[in-house]
Amino acid sequence: MTDGHLFNNILLGGRAGSNPGQFKVYSGGLAWKRQGGGKTIEIEKSDLTSVTWMKVPRAYQLGVRTKDGLFYKFIGFREQDVSSLTNFMQKNMGLSPDEKQLSVSGQNWGGIDINGNMLTFMVGSKQAFEVSLADVSQTQMQGKTDVLLEFHVDDTTGGNEKDSLMDLSFHVPTSNTQFLGDENRTAAQVLWETIMGVADVDSSEEAVVTFEGIAILTPRGRYSVELHLSFLRLQGQANDFKIQYSSIVRLFLLPKSNNPHTFVVVTLDPPIRKGQTLYPHIVIQFETEAVVERNLALTKEVLAEKYKDRLEESYKGLIHEVFTKVLRGLSGAKVTRPGSFRSCQDGYAVKSSLKAEDGLLYPLEKGFFFLPKPPTLILHEEIEFVEFERHGAGGASISSHYFDLLVKLKNDQEHLFRNIQRSEYHNLFNFINGKHLKIMNLGDGQGATGGVTAVLRDTDDDAVDPHLERIKNQAGDEESDEEDEDFVADKDDSGSPTDDSGGEDSDASESGGEKEKLSKKEASSSKPPVKRKPKGRDEEGSDKRKPKKKKDPNAPKRAMTPFMYFSMAERGNMKNNNPDLPTTEIAKKLGEMWQKMTGEEKQPYIQQSQVDKKRYEKESAVYRGAAAMDVDSGSGGNESD
């Protein structure tokens, strides 16, 4: 980059362990973003007070201190990075990094340096270790010469580490010259009072504000929510969670559409843990019209010194607004509200299903959020493409009044949002298209007069839907209808074996209205024999079927999805174990099995699909070259007849 430096695999050090991410330094400041999404740290140049370099095992550490007294440790720089970054900071940011040395002697006596909220134990001029006083929950005297620090034990700390620091004790002899005592106070008491002035040690005694009987959907239950100075506590009948504000990444305030409730989501990094289950999102549900009045248990001095312009003495208003304002003021987390998207009913979300759960999909300015269960946040920058999948693509047994939205991530993970009403198609497509996200399955009609655009302009369900026609043509494979129904009934494989006949996208955009009307008549009548469907279509819609008859037998077979490989492997076992199970139920069972599988269990099928995809790409390249030669010779059409 021209305006700075970019580094990958830089660790953010902290009491909860080290997380890898991407580090960027530029003329306006610096930023760190966790790998795979989550926590982000942005520091403006004007907020920086000091920068230090330290040689640590196998790497260099960059220490950054801010005006708020916070200290960040970025670990993983190479020796050659030190000089280049130092020169860049001196030239563009007006900062000259200092160099610190790490004590490796193992000596456990030395001096204490308190700078901001960081306590550093020094052995001579070298640093032995440092701890953040913001993590201290209690400090007390033990005898006359010992000071004990107890650290917060919350449900997020230690998510990445097996061990966590619980307490630390300092012995301060009466002869200590750094913390001078007198007749009434020993040197240890002077140190204790100094720490008391920095650490939020009183925060565990009394909550700043409490909200009783709050419904939390994830983790489910009714809780008393206490907001303290440095953490929040969720107290329920069966569970008790303590969460440091430093673990809060962002707050989301999302009203339900046509519903008397509003979601407030607290996103965490690291997440809280209950048994083996991790909860990266706390989903709170408030009554939208409920009004509360709360007075904060803070003195005017504390409000003026620590929370100026962030908190007020008292609040009165809607409960979700009061809760969000107070939590934002205490934690410093940003709040995300609904953006420009509006549903067909002027709501902020569309009804859909994820896996086996019904919920709401919120299209936000920088991502999608599915609530309430499982709460799933997808950022736009993580998306490789989205794909609209219309119901009815494999037969008339499923209503065409709904469609599915497949979101494929850059890490090959997929999210399939099902059963979205067709009336939401127009607004959802326009919103996604406006965010410049790649949309698959548009066929050739991406202009203003064809393809999906034509569908979006039609609100009548009987109108011609070129996008649906294209998928129906793909689904009209010449293999057995029974196999097609198996894969269409379960949408987990966003393609099904019908992809074998999907090489005629341009034909779909040219189909007339007679074909769809004919299929609707067939769907409304009693079920005809399977063999009568193509026969009836040939009689009245022969023009529509001609492209199908002209399909080149030399065309390469489409690549199969991981779910298709899984279905092929397990379908026989499913039929043997359940001989009386209908075909559509077998597909449904296979889909449920696929959803419950872990990433490791899916890996063999994913690898098979990737190999098949490469095969298809190679064969397609050869086929396109041969097809171009046939077109030039002008003999392809006569031979097919």
Curated annotation (Swiss-Prot):
CDD domains documented for this protein: HMG-box_SF, PH1_SSRP1-like, PH2_SSRP1-like
One GO CC term on file: FACT complex
Annotated segments matching region Disordered: 459-561
Keywords tagged on the record: Chromosome, DNA damage, DNA repair, DNA replication, DNA-binding, Nucleus, Transcription, Transcription regulation
SUPFAM superfamilies: HMG-box, PH domain-like
Compartment(s): Nucleus; Chromosome
Comp. bias intervals (Acidic residues): 476-487
InterPro entries hit by this protein: HMG_box_dom, HMG_box_dom_sf, PH-like_dom_sf, RTT106/SPT16-like_middle_dom, RTT106/SSRP1_HistChap/FACT, SSRP1-like_PH1, SSRP1/POB3, SSRP1/POB3_N
DNA-binding region as annotated in the record: 556-624
Biased composition (Basic and acidic residues): 512-524
Molecular function per GO: DNA binding; histone binding; nucleosome binding
GO BP term (any one): DNA repair
PANTHER family referenced in this protein's UniProt entry, alphabetically: FACT COMPLEX SUBUNIT SSRP1
Function: Component of the FACT complex, a general chromatin factor that acts to reorganize nucleosomes. The FACT complex is involved in multiple processes that require DNA as a template such as mRNA elongation, DNA replication and DNA repair. During transcription elongation the FACT complex acts as a histone chaperone that both destabilizes and restores nucleosomal structure.
Assembly mode: Component of the FACT complex, a stable heterodimer of SPT16 and SSRP1.
Family according to the record: Belongs to the SSRP1 family.
Full protein name: FACT complex subunit SSRP1-A
Protein's organism: Oryza sativa subsp. japonica (Rice)
Gene, per the UniProt record: SSRP1-A
